[in-house]
Amino acid sequence: MDTERIGVGKIIGTHGIRGEVKVFPLTDFPERFRPGTRLILEQEGADGREGRTFPVTVISVRPGKGNLILKLAEINDADQAGAVRGATLKVEPWEVEPLPEGHYYIYQLLGSRVYTTGGEFLGILRDILATGANDVYVVRNEDAGEILIPALKTVVRQVDLARKEIRVELPPGLRD
């Protein structure tokens, strides 16, 4: 199992004088921020210095304009809130919300080796683009370059998280 923490929100600013923070959610599960929830705040250090990491507890949450406004128990004023701007709120991998069968988190798929159903190696899944209709897998291969693969059930035939492998059946003309 992955041991790297999973980002669920990005602190993008402060709100008011009582230490509330504006959070851009990185999750499709807003209940992740319900009062009483424990999260891990990770802040990168500047100029190569080590950043800060500490646990925080959500006291309250309410909707903002395109974001959420959170009050965290450990942040008590606007100065403290400003000091954590840019930090990421994370959870441990075993704390992620379970998904229905056949659905995956982006972090689970990135880095997977992608093959055709015939066994041809296409490359490594490096990015996933959200296009509205369906996601698109960005697969890169040092020799063949980049290929964009629609993330459709008719195309993505098998995902093996344990082996970090994805099998696809490319639509005709995709590589022409």
UniProtKB/Swiss-Prot annotation:
- GO MF: ribosome binding
> Looking at the Swiss-Prot or TrEMBL record, what is one Pfam family this protein matches?
RimM
Main location class = cytoplasm
Entry keywords, A to Z: Chaperone, Cytoplasm, Ribosome biogenesis, rRNA processing
Q: Name one GO cellular component term.
A: ribosome
Family matches, as Gene3D superfamilies = PRC-barrel domain (2.30.30.240), RimM (2.40.30.60)
Signal peptide boundaries:
none
Any one biological process term the GO annotation gives? rRNA processing
Residue ranges occupied by any PRC barrel domain in the UniProt entry: 101-174
For whether the record's keyword set contains Secreted, the answer is: no
Q: Where in the cell is it found?
A: Cytoplasm
The answer to whether the entry has keyword Chaperone is: yes
Task: State the source organism's domain of life.
Answer: Bacteria
Q: What is known of its domains?
A: The PRC barrel domain binds ribosomal protein uS19.
By sequence similarity, the record places it as follows: Belongs to the RimM family.
What function does this protein fulfil? An accessory protein needed during the final step in the assembly of 30S ribosomal subunit, possibly for assembly of the head region. Essential for efficient processing of 16S rRNA. May be needed both before and after RbfA during the maturation of 16S rRNA. It has affinity for free ribosomal 30S subunits but not for 70S ribosomes.
Oligomeric form and interacting partners: Binds ribosomal protein uS19.
UniProt-recorded name of the protein: Ribosome maturation factor RimM
Name the gene that codes for it.
rimM
